[in-house]
Design a protein with these regions (language model features):
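Conserved, single-site charged/polar hotspot
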Residues: 1-202
Length: 205
């Protein structure tokens, strides 16, 4: 298989060149630095094992703990879904009647505040749905748009484990944190080390 050189901007090239010999480690081993677009307000506790979009991925990983990410509100992906009678997506309508959902219960959360499952109510009947949204961290806000059409909004994008891209942007822009401070915030107990000829041990997943 042949690979061609990736085309990128000079700014990106300089950024990569500046840190090319640095690695993020935990107890001497290179970490699996997972990340997602937006974590809502807290990242999830990361655990490995059976692949799941919920909080539990298997056994606990010490450097993937729930941490604060307070700048998400300004930078997160804000999504709105119309749930009026003309909305046809089955995940927001009762598949039996076609009627829009009337309410949602998202109180079933883990310690990081992430919804484990949600219960939607339509015509007095309750249905439990798991992992039917783009994010495992979301908050429902029922209301109407400018035209009076019922809408539901939620925030967060991705699995929410490890570094949040939106949160990292917020920490840099609002608090002046550098990349080392941001990485050490999101990866609990991790250290940035310089790569040497004595290679660091790699993690095994």
């Amino acid at each position: 298989m042949l690979y061609s050189e990736l085309q990128c901007s000079e700014a990106i090239r300089k950024a990569v060149e500046a840190v090319k010999d640095e690695v993020l480690t935990y107890n001497g081993s290179v970490i699996d630095a997972v990340w997602s677009a937006s974590a809502g307000y807290n990242t999830q506790t990361g655990v490995y094992g059976t692949c799941s979009s919920r909080d539990a991925w298997g056994t606990e990983v010490p450097y993937l703990q729930s941490v604060e990410s307070p700048y998400e509100e300004q930078y997160h992906n804000l999504l709105r879904r119309v749930i009026g009678k003309d909305y046809t997506y089955i995940e927001y309508n009762d598949s039996r009647t076609g009627e829009p959902y009337q309410s949602a219960d998202t109180t079933h959360k883990d310690l990081g505040g992430f919804v484990q499952y949600n219960t939607l109510v339509s015509n007095g009947r309750s249905y439990r749905y798991i992992n039917q949204f783009v994010s495992s961290r979301y908050c429902f806000d029922f209301g109407t748009d400018a035209g009076g059409t019922p809408c539901m909004t939620y925030y967060g994008f991705g699995h929410g484990v490890g570094m949040s891209q939106c949160g990292a942007v917020g920490y840099a822009a609002e608090k002046g944190m550098n990349y080392k401070q941001i990485l050490q915030h999101y990866y609990t107990g991790a250290q940035i080390r310089t790569r040497t000829t004595r290679s660091l041990s790699l993690i095994h997943i």
